[in-house]
Amino acid sequence: MTPHYSLHQGDAREVLQGLEDESVDLVLSDPPYLEEFIPLYGDLAREAGRVLKQDGFLIFYIGHYHLETVMKMVADVPALSYYWLVSQWNMSGMAKIMARRQICGFKPILIYRKGKALPNGWPLDILTMGGRSKNFHAWEQDVKESRYLVQHYSRPGDTVLDPFLGSGTTGVASLQAGREFVGVELDPETFAIAKTRIERTLWQSHADRTVQTPLEEWIAPECNKLLHPLGGCNNL
């Protein structure tokens, strides 16, 4: 059965108001990190707390600089509780945070849950990132990485929501993994790119095929030798 999807061009704060309570299983998104956009994280958390089903997950990327501020925002949403922090380890280049005189080698991915949700299997909290593609958008994330998160924090047939769709990576990953998808993007040109990518994904994929990402693809090399059968690594 072909997964269904729904795409919306507009302001996520307005579009999400039209979603029913407890209608989504996973919210996975990469909002902008610049200071002027940080209040959007609070809006995202409040809406996620409303639209997520019991035992659903909220997962989002965030820069180090505003990590504390954003975590305080999400802590004010009673429906959500902190679950875990995943490290997106950048193997191809490390950024200098000039205001803090700090070299940054990984990006935080924050995971919150509603209820007592647990992931599928034993997902790792270190994801390796080589040179990621920028073919569609300057802030584009890797499809394999998004698919890994989708596969572990939702189940086939679940509904995944991305309120900051960008070029559509989360949508592509969700449909490849056999999930329903809802995406929202403000910029008309970027929305058109996302729409084309997602439509092409459905055209290229078999209707009943779920693409599985091998666990080993996302184990940091130093962690690979130390991997416990149930997940986790030591002495990193």
Q: In which residue ranges do the predicted regions lie?
A:
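S-adenosyl-L-methionine
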Residues: 1-16, 195-232
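Core catalytic lobe of class I
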Residues: 1-192, 235
